[in-house]
Amino acid sequence: IVQPMSHTSLDQIRDTIISELEAAGRDDIKVVTENANNDTTALSTIMQNLRSEGVDIVVPIATNTAQSAKAAFEGEDTPIIFSAVSDPTAAGLTGSDCENITGVSNNIPSDEIVKLISNFQPGYKKIGFLYTSSETNSVSTINAAKAYCDENNIAYAEASISSLSELPTAVQTLLSEGVDALYTGNDNSIASAMPTYTDAAYSS
């Protein structure tokens, strides 16, 4: 089981997989857990090591982890069972070269989320979309939200980050553009730094 970093939802997925195996009485299965700690190079190394060790099944958590597993195990028939992947098709995890790959999507209906904004921010005029540019899952979610806004004449601004060090500045940039609400979709990097995100938003 491999996760790209630690935050509540990713940790919960890992722990639930392990507890369900235990509940099923599968104590014959050796479970190895790995965490790349938000390091892309480490993630690739972890996958290559698992391939060398000859694991029977790989369970990558989140989109970039699943993509890394696919690349590392190319040419192998090792089953890859992903979880927490927002858009498997956009992530390149479906198709003829993915016959050994399956899993569970955690896609968020972006239109419904945008509709909910008015529940806690009535009369808002402009949404600020913030996402990590390297996360396919996040880009896909935000693109769907922007499409809904375009169809419904909802104004928005957007900002992307390539590292968490850019997060406070990106938040301030959106606020300076007059947004009334901030929206981030399935974004593991930003989710792992939620206190930084909220502090930047509320400090204005």
Residue ranges of predicted features:
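Short beta-strand elements in bilobed, periplasmic/extracellular small-molecule ligand-binding domains
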Residues: 18, 23-43, 100, 146-164
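Pocket-lining segment of extracytoplasmic ligand-binding domains
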Residues: 136-203
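Extracytoplasmic "Venus flytrap"
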Residues: 1-18, 24-26, 32-41, 134-138, ...
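An alpha-beta-alpha
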Residues: 17, 103-152
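Beta-alpha junction/loop-to-helix N-cap segments that form part of ligand/metal-binding clefts
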Residues: 33-95, 187-204
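Extracytoplasmic/secreted envelope proteins and their assembly/folding machinery
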Residues: 14, 18, 44-47, 51, ...
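Ser/Thr/Gly-rich flexible loops in soluble cytosolic domains mediating phosphotransfer, phosphorylation
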Residues: 82-110, 116
